Amino acid sequence: MILPVAIGVALLGGTAHGMFHRNSRVFGSVLGELPPDGRRVSLTFDDGPNPEATPRILDSLAEQGVKATFFILGAHAERWPDLVLRVSREGHQIGNHGYFHRKLHLRSPFYVKRDITLGKRAIERAGVDTPRFFRAPHGFRSPWVTSIASSLGERTIGWSLGVWDSDLPGVNAIVDRTVEGSRPGSIILLHDGDGYNINGDRSQTAAAVPKIIAALRDRGFEFVTLPSA
């Protein structure tokens, strides 16, 4: 009796880890950090574009000569395609964040494929190349999310440092959390948009970005984009 219970507990634990841990490999390959050779980090932004924050962030990145990766929501891409196009034209990577910003861990394969496909098409209609990356909202995945994304040509990306800038903790808190938490190979998660409020305030993140770049450079970090394979 003990053995079946132990097996059941292990299976449940593995399933939970696969669903809720952003970098779990239980349900397939996911890139959660860069190779730790050298002091390299990667800035990534979710839930955009946003007509207020995204241009400010792009301006800061251009001024500092930094390239980043933007995981774009399809619904927002349809509303502000000009910003999607600007992200691409300024040399940043574009990833797919789905269309609806719904947690995918309990969704059917049909729903998951539809969400990722709609997001992909919305990005393409903005006039940019097909996205090569996918990041699930909140990092939540089911056994089929990664395989469906892969079938659509998109590599699943997690992150190694989330600073909860979406909670609006203040500019200084966002900067401090990012700088203190960064390690060689960190994939840093920030937000230039709001997945639940199309007019959400991301001014704190926009104000924090140039300070983050300056502080991390002072510590010897170099900014790179994500590897495609």
Please annotate each region the language model reported.
Residues M19-H105, Y111, L118, A122, ...:
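Active-site beta->alpha N-cap acidic-glycine motif
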Residues D46, L61, I94, F134-P137, ...:
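Divalent metal-coordination and catalytic microenvironments
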Residues R102-R107, G195-N199:
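A short acidic, helix-capping loop that chelates divalent metal ions and anchors anionic groups
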Residues F140, V145-G181, F221-S228:
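His/Asp/Glu-enriched short active-site or ligand-binding loop at hydrolase and phosphoryl-transfer sites
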Residues F45-D47, I72-G74, N96-G98, A136-H138, ...:
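A cross-domain feature marking catalytic cores of carbohydrate-active enzymes
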Residues Y111-I116, V171-D176, R202-V209:
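Charged helix-capping and loop-helix junction motifs
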Residues M1-F20:
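Hydrophobic alpha-helical topogenic segments used for membrane insertion/localization
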